[in-house]
């Protein structure tokens, strides 16, 4: 029997995660800790991968993480994860993180990376 695999477009599994930077998430300089941001990015990427594959997925590798700017207590962080390539048993996911200042509404890119999930 010939069974066709269901095709999913990247937009169907794109994931948006939102967090608020709290004092416990910051370093002694009052900036969001890089490790906390990478944790949030990993959760968004895992949800994206599992939504796309309809299976439990784990992070296989994280390529270069670029920390472009910082975020402070009270900033709203939005993390966008999207599938960029799919292979037989793995997929590549692009993750970008943005910060938004509550009072001014200014939104800016704070980090990005590419990662593989299996």
Features from the language model and the residues they span:
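Hot-dog-fold acyl-thioester-processing enzymes
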Residues: 2-58, 118
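A contiguous binding-surface segment within folded domains or other stable secondary-structure elements
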Residues: 40, 44-100
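HotDog/MaoC-like acyl-thioester-processing domains
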Residues: 4-16, 72-76, 84-118
